Amino acid sequence: MSKTYHFIGIKGSGMSALALMLHQMGHKVQGSDVEKYYFTQRGLEQAGITILPFDEKNLDGDMEIIAGNAFRPDNNVEIAYADQNGISYKRYHEFLGSFMRDFVSMGVAGAHGKTSTTGMLSHVLSHITDTSFLIGDGTGRGSANAKYFVFESDEYERHFMPYHPEYSIITNIDFDHPDYFTSLEDVFNAFNDYAKQITKGLFVYGEDAELRKITSDAPIYYYGFEAEGNDFVASDLLRSTTGSTFTVHFRGQNLGQFHIPTFGRHNIMNATAVIGLLYTAGFDLNLVREHLKTFAGVKRRFTEKIVNDTVIIDDFAHHPTEIIATLDAARQKYPSKEIVAVFQPHTFTRTIALLDDFAHALNQADAVYLAQIYGSAREVDHGDVKVEDLANKINKKHQVITVENVSPLLDHDNAVYVFMGAGDIQTYEYSFERLLSNLTSNVQ
């Protein structure tokens, strides 16, 4: 295995996961990216994978080059050099589409919940049998002996179209990525095209009106909470501060009781989808049940830490539906605490398109603090929307804060702080953690 894989933009969540997976399969891997720290690079560094600054000297015609989708000749020296010198490269999704042909592949698509569900499916299946997987939180695992491959299937710019998996879950369809999709119908059409490429089994959330219209040549299995019209049904829910317990039926047949140590109704649905897929694929449900109990979650999805007796939750939620799910999970685990949301809107286009929905979602918290909008590299701020526009629509106690001054967050007793966003919301979180630590130091 002398070939070197070079990743242009290796810190991207999907790219870093793929790099780790290929490294673990015995391939030589390196990559390039900006110097700014990103949470995915820790895993790369621990694996001993070299991360270089962008430079045309990084490229060699004998390499297999995989390029992040955001990089073009006008914004990246390596892409420009490759184009000028006839050096071939594949985009992430193009490489993945050909890579998965050697496995029994299982995809997880959907507007929300992809990463958590991919993580759950990967965790369970890899404990049952040798499995390679790619999770959108930057986690990847590879094995030269794996028969199965689990991956996150991303709809943005229809990147999932090169994929033809045997099985796939679609968690939901929702209007997002307004910088690319023109309407909910456009989003549906993308998912419907993807669904037609599944070959053995498609598992969709049956209480999503859009998903009910999905068509596929593969058998379609619906899962949900409602007995009528769904194949896999979760019932007898018991939600507590230690997780969720529920029973699953398949077309009237009791498949037994299951427990997950995660929170929120959405995670019960994620687990039901995983159970349905693995049951249909012929796996022992006793093993599925056993390994669901130990699923601890994925990075930046309801990730908790305690600083000076203060609970801080970090979550990637950046769409109203995701915010509602995250706040629901926080209330399940901490029913007696005040839920304080600290949210950074991600992209101006999404903020404009979903402004009222964001306000409705954030009003599920007891208090709301807003960071300045985090603009995407793909867009320009034309001044059409400001974070104050969102603040004005929030009914609960609210305030706009800066990363330099997060002290207003101290105005709460017995609170859980839920930091949400897909930009650099973690810098606000770290600023708050330093403030809490300094308070203790001063007291001591």
Swiss-Prot record:
EC number(s) recorded for this UniProt protein: 6.3.2.8
Pathway assigned to this chain's UniProt record: Cell wall biogenesis; peptidoglycan biosynthesis
GO BP term, example: regulation of cell shape
Pfam families xrefs: Mur_ligase (PF01225), Mur_ligase_C (PF02875), Mur_ligase_M (PF08245)
Superkingdom of the organism of origin: Bacteria
An example Gene Ontology CC term for this record: cytoplasm
Location(s), subcellular: Cytoplasm
Main location: cytoplasm
Classification via PANTHER family: UDP-N-ACETYLMURAMATE--L-ALANINE LIGASE, UDP-N-ACETYLMURAMATE--L-ALANINE LIGASE-RELATED
HAMAP family the record matches: MurC (MF_00046)
Similarity field: Belongs to the MurCDEF family.
Protein name: UDP-N-acetylmuramate--L-alanine ligase
